[in-house]
Regions:
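Conserved signature/switch motifs of ABC ATPase nucleotide-binding domains
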Residues: 133, 151, 182
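Helical segment within the ABC ATPase nucleotide-binding domain
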Residues: 170-182
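Catalytic Walker B motif of ABC-type/P-loop ATPase nucleotide-binding domains
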Residues: 156-160
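Conserved H-loop
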Residues: 183-190
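Conserved ABC ATPase signature
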Residues: 131-135, 139-141
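ABC ATPase NBD coupling module
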Residues: 61-79, 103, 108-109
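Conserved ABC ATPase "signature" region
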Residues: 59-64, 109-127, 178
Length: 212
């Protein structure tokens, strides 16, 4: 589903406008501290800009003119996978992945069915009964990806998805991401040009608060 983003956030010096076509993956690159993660937070609904609008498939999710429109994060069908996995320590892997659909109102059984399907898709079904502290960095990142997919988002936002993975595991995860993103609308923040080429259809550059 296509995504259209336009907003300004003076505190971060951002004046942003870009579009992502249906089924397209776009990489977002720029210097450290330039605001790449902030852009994802605005799109996900975790941060309200000073002004702007956001459309997903022609449906307005944010329009800050006049009385304003702002759809909360849980109703946007947009999922953000943060740079750190942030798995819930008191839940095992299966219930971490099932947490999203369960919170959205799916039954316990349906949430777990969806979680198992996503664990299988990311090659992590064997970790279903482990806790977060029992996973390596690469395993945690794969589980976080499964959790993001279990929410069945229309747009997937990935913030440096390979940053927490060692060199040995990064190639496997890169190949997995490339395969999963083939049929999804996504925005991937990455500092690595190789990751951008492997994962994205095109690359946007953030410079001095604007997309180039």
């Amino acid at each position: 589903m296509s995504l259209r983003v336009q907003f300004a956030l003076a505190q971060r010096g951002l004046d942003i406008a870009f579009e992502v076509a249906d089924g397209e993956t776009v990489a977002l690159r720029g210097p450290n501290g330039s605001g790449k993660s902030t852009i994802l937070e605005v799109v996900a609904g975790l941060l309200v800009p000073d002004r702007g609008s956001l459309e997903l498939g022609g449906r307005r999710l944010m329009d800050l003119r006049g009385r304003g429109l702002w759809v909360p994060p849980h109703r946007r069908r947009i999922t953000l996978m943060a740079q750190r996995p942030l798995l819930l320590p008191h839940l095992d892997v299966l219930d971490n992945v099932a947490f999203g659909p369960r919170s959205a109102g799916a039954s316990r059984a349906e949430s777990r069915r969806r979680a198992r399907r996503c664990l299988e898709a990311t090659g992590t079904e064997q970790y279903a009964r482990r806790r977060a502290h029992e996973l390596s960095g690469g395993q945690s990142q794969r589980v976080a990806l499964a959790r993001a997919l279990a929410a069945e988002p229309e747009v997937l936002l990935l913030d440096e998805p390979l940053a927490a993975v060692d060199a040995e595991g990064s190639q496997d995860l890169r190949e997995l991401l490339a395969r999963l993103l083939e049929v999804r609308t996504a925005v991937v923040v990455t500092h690595d040009p190789d990751d951008a080429r492997a994962l994205a259809d095109r690359t946007l550059h953030l410079e001095a608060g604007r997309i180039r």
